[in-house]
Amino acid sequence: YEIVRLKENINQMQPSFSMEEANAAKDYILSGGFLTEYRHTRELEARLAEFIGIKHCFMVSNGTLAISAALLAVGITKDSKVLVPTYTMVATANAVRLLGATPVFVDVSESTNTISPEIVRAHIEEVDAVIHVSLNNRVKNLEEIVSICKQYKKPLVEDAAQSLGSTYKGQALGTFGDIATFSFSSPNKTN
């Protein structure tokens, strides 16, 4: 094997902007715009909702907060238990703990690195909600997980941070559960 060095560095976590993007941000700031109330946010929310095929889209500052807000929206409180896969970004479990709720960690399938219907069924009665993480766009039997959650009247929160633009059986990931979260953090994929 030969190691090939790239001529251009591709930053993984450090922001990388084109001159057009940098100038647009500069122009916005110089026009008196607040960085925390970016007037183009509503436009982005509308365009993302249309792209994914959903009614509502709300931007927040990070993925942990997005998952916490989603859990609040489906009724999770400090006394709740939430099924969380063991193989995920720590933010998934941290979002549960941020609300004072208890994560119930479960193993993932070897073939997909995500929770399986069998795992969900084995734990569904002991939890108040299920978080499904479509890690690296790898999904299998999601419709069965949706069915189990509906049967037991447990909300399904989709952590689709790594699946923006991906589909499963022709349907956009992030549209199967009761609510979903996405992320624009640099390690996450967009398709």
What are these model-predicted stretches?
Residues 1-34:
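N-terminal "arm"/small-domain region of PLP-dependent enzymes with the aminotransferase-like
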Residues 15, 107, 135, 183-186:
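Conserved donor-binding loops in enzymes that form glycosidic bonds
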Residues 34-81, 95-98, 105-107, 171:
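Phosphate-binding glycine-rich loop
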Residues 72-160, 167:
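PLP-dependent aminotransferase-like
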Residues 158-191:
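Conserved active-site segment immediately N-terminal to the catalytic lysine
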